[in-house]
């Protein structure tokens, strides 16, 4: 009797799963941005979310859950029901956080279903316009002399800005005053107003402010110059051959999300990444999408795993003590 009941239940579940996938989504989806509004991840999340919303026929609501270098928003996603209605956009900080934090409430590699890679691009080292330096050489000399007298913003431990700062301090053999924010959006506001001295931020956030003359750029952290800032040198060409920090974003769902739902969301992301308007916006912001055929769920999982290993080595070598 029990065997027949279990068999019947299995048949019902098997029949219902395709229906669930076919009708998904039948209500709004929440896309968690683990940093404050106005920052690079927020900008990208809204761009991608708007396109995916049109493809899926449902509203995608952006929820900014900042704090702890992006781990607060990641934890919220990991705890969510694995039904495709809670998504996460995150960048390299998700991978680095696996080493930077001792007691994360999730397993970085196991607790997320990658939906696809979105974009990749460099950071730009910038300062307030009131700083009396004009060139990278002058800025570096000023940082070395000032030490903790100069303030650099970060989006918290484990954020890309924090990792960039970590590498910069190691290369210059200096410790400066790091000011944590809930995202580089608020940090950029303080930089523009002159309350913050310097910041290492993504091109998506910094290029519009540079072009508007509201902040001063010194160098990019990629191996090649940025097309939108052709006169801005790379740190690599400026005497720091081992300095490279490249940001990458990916989209995730909680572990256990049905494969059919993962594929449907991944397909909607692919539509967004082929949208000419989004590609034009990416170009304006100095970032590029991952190549077609190299950005699906499997590629995103491989990228996450390799980046966890990469940053574990970098952070361990730096002597950084993991935080709680």
Regions found by a protein language model. Name each.
Residues 79-85, 99-186, 235, 248-281:
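Hinge/capping helix and adjacent helix->loop/strand transition within the periplasmic-binding protein
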Residues 26-28, 237, 259-324:
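An extracytoplasmic/periplasmic, membrane-proximal ligand-sensing/linker region
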Residues 107-117, 175-179, 197, 207-245, ...:
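Short beta-strand->loop
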Residues 1-9:
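Bacterial N-terminal signal peptides that target proteins for export
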Residues 21-110, 149, 173-202, 209, ...:
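N-terminal (or domain-start) structured segment
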Residues 89-94, 154, 184, 201-206, ...:
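Beta->alpha turn/N-cap motifs
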Residues 16-18:
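N-terminal signal peptide c-region/cleavage motif recognized by signal peptidases
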């Amino acid at each position: 009797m029990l065997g027949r009941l279990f068999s019947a239940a299995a048949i019902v579940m098997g029949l219902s799963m395709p229906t669930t996938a076919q009708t998904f989504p039948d209500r709004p989806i929440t896309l968690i941005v683990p940093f404050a509004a106005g920052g690079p991840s927020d900008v990208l999340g809204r761009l991608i979310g708007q396109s995916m919303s049109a493809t899926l026929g449902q509203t995608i609501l952006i929820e900014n859950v900042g704090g702890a270098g992006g781990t607060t928003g990641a934890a919220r996603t990991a705890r969510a029901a694995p039904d495709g209605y809670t998504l996460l956009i995150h960048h390299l900080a998700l991978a680095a956080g696996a080493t930077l934090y001792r007691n994360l409430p999730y397993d970085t590699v196991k607790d997320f279903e990658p939906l696809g890679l979105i974009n990749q691009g460099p950071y730009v080292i910038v300062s307030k316009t009131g700083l009396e330096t004009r060139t990278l050489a002058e800025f570096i000399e000023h940082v070395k002399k000032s030490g903790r007298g100069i303030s650099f913003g970060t989006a918290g431990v484990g954020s890309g800005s924090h990792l960039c700062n970590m590498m910069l301090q190691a290369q210059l053999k200096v410790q400066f005053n790091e000011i944590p924010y809930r995202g580089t959006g608020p940090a950029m506001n303080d930089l523009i107003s002159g309350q913050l001295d310097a910041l290492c931020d993504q091109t998506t956030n910094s290029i519009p402010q540079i072009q508007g003359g509201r902040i001063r750029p010194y160098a990019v952290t990629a191996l090649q110059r940025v097309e939108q800032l052709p006169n801005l040198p790379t740190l690599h060409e400026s005497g720091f051959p081992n300095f490279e920090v490249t940001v990458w974003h990916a989209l995730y769902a909680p572990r256990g999300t049905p494969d059919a739902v993962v594929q449907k969301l991944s397909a909607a992301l692919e539509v967004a990444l082929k949208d000419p308007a989004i590609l034009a916006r990416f170009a304006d912001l100095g970032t590029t999408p991952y190549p077609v055929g190299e950005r699906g769920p499997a590629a995103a999982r491989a990228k996450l795993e390799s980046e966890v290993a990469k940053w574990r080595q970098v952070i361990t070598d730096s002597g950084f003590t993991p935080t709680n």
